[in-house]
Structures are given as C-alpha cells and as structure tokens.
A protein has these predicted regions:
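A compositional/biophysical signature of low hydrophobicity enriched in polar/charged and small residues
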Residues: 5-136
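N-terminal low-complexity segments that are often proline-rich with Ser/Thr-Pro
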Residues: 1-2
C-alpha cells in the first residue's frame, strides 16, 4: 500500500541521516538455555584536558565485551554494560583490560542476577494466582 511504502521511505531516510542507529533483537538468554552474564560497571576516570571524557570513552567502547558506555552525573563518571559467558570472564576483563588503562582511577562491578524488564520489554512471565481469596 501507499502508506506502507511511505513508512519504508521514512525509515530509509532516517537510517541514511543517522537518526536510526540500528535494530536489535532482545533475547531471553535464560529461556534459550545459554550461559550469559551481564555486569554494570561504574568507572571513575581522569579525563584528558583537551578531549574530556571522549577519548577514554572511545577506547573503552572499542572492546568487544562492552555493550554500552554512558557518561553519568553523580558519584562516578562512566557506566558500562559488559557481557560475557561467565562471572570469571567479566572479572578477568575488568582486571586485565579495563583497570590497567591509564585514565581509569577506580571501578565498581555489579553483576546482574536477574532481568525483569529491559528496553521496555518484560522478561518474566507473570504467574497469576487465580484462586479466590475470602477475607473473614
């Protein structure tokens, strides 16, 4: 239909202009039976005088393990989301690759134990208790 072709044209234009950065499939790795560990890492860094946080953020973003890098306000400078297959793999990444970077002053690693909602999608199937409750 004409309306559908207009939507595709708008999507193509938005991709060409860099407005749409990409598409992503959200996978429930637990349901898929795949070992996948996620961690949120808080970093305090020493920014460069001429480039601020951009240089160290770009260096960190280049690591394959890094899913996201965010400049934060508050108690720390950068927030990272890291993915790996085991807790040890992430711990080794922090110890061997992240912490040794000259501009990294400190790290605090928080392992994700369970995901309930991510990017607007619920991950847990709600169990509904359909028994009636009588209050006496």
């Amino acid at each position: 239909s004409s309306a559908a072709s207009d939507v595709y044209k708008r999507q193509d234009l938005a991709r060409a202009q860099g407005i749409i950065k990409g598409y992503k499939t959200l996978v429930d790795w637990e349901k898929a039976g795949v070992n996948r560990v996620e961690a949120v890492i808080e970093l305090n860094v020493s920014p460069k005088k001429s480039r601020g946080f951009d240089e160290i953020a770009a260096t960190i973003a280049a690591f394959d393990e890094v899913e996201s890098v965010l400049l934060m306000s508050g108690g720390y400078d950068l927030q990272l989301v890291i993915k790996g297959q085991t807790f040890q793999e992430i711990a080794l990444f922090v110890a061997k690759r992240l912490s040794p970077l000259d501009d990294v002053l400190s790290t605090a690693t928080h392992f994700v134990l369970r995901t309930y909602k991510k990017e607007g999608r619920l991950y847990q199937d709600e169990e509904i208790d359909e028994r009636e409750c009588t209050v006496l």
